[in-house]
Amino acid sequence: MAPSTKAASAKKAVVKGSNGSKALKVRTSTTFRLPKTLKLTRAPKYARKAVPHYQRLDNYKVIVAPIASETAMKKVEDGNTLVFQVDIKANKHQIKQAVKDLYEVDVLAVNTLIRPNGTKKAYVRLTADHDALDIANKIGYI
């Protein structure tokens, strides 16, 4: 009598094991890298502050004053560049946006430096379609 196939496969599963053997992955590094887990976006039930803080730096606070020294005038005439004293906390993006909004000009680049007296100076280079001399006249520091 031949044993039934179902019984034979059950016997084989008991002897061998139904899961089989898993090939182990060889670790080549000594550091264990934790896998990235799901990070859900925050959805707060209520605001933690009753009133949001007012804007710390608006356009009029970013630009303190134009600088009208001889070297600054040379930059205006030769380099199509305006020179401003700006707030110490203002970054290049804020300076660019402030000049764009206040004087209706397109800005090509902004270079900044901290002066020895602790103030920040910004060199604002304008695009070719805007003349720095005209803008300086409009501002009123020539």
Curated annotation (Swiss-Prot):
The record's listing under InterPro entries reads: Nucleotide-bd_a/b_plait_sf (IPR012677), Ribosomal_uL23-like (IPR013025), Ribosomal_uL23/eL15/eS24_sf (IPR012678), Ribosomal_uL23_CS (IPR001014), Ribosomal_uL23_N (IPR005633)
Name of the protein in its database record:
Large ribosomal subunit protein uL23
**Family designation:** Belongs to the universal ribosomal protein uL23 family.
Pfam families the UniProt entry points to: Ribosomal_L23 (PF00276), Ribosomal_L23eN (PF03939)
Q: Name one GO molecular function term.
A: rRNA binding
Task: Give the record's GO biological process terms.
Answer: translation
Natural source organism: Cyberlindnera jadinii (Torula yeast)
GO terms under cellular component: ribonucleoprotein complex; ribosome
UniProt keyword annotation of Phosphoprotein present: no
Q: Which UniProt keywords apply?
A: Ribonucleoprotein, Ribosomal protein, RNA-binding, rRNA-binding
This chain's function reads: This protein binds to a specific region on the 26S rRNA.
Q: Which domain of life is it from?
A: Eukaryota
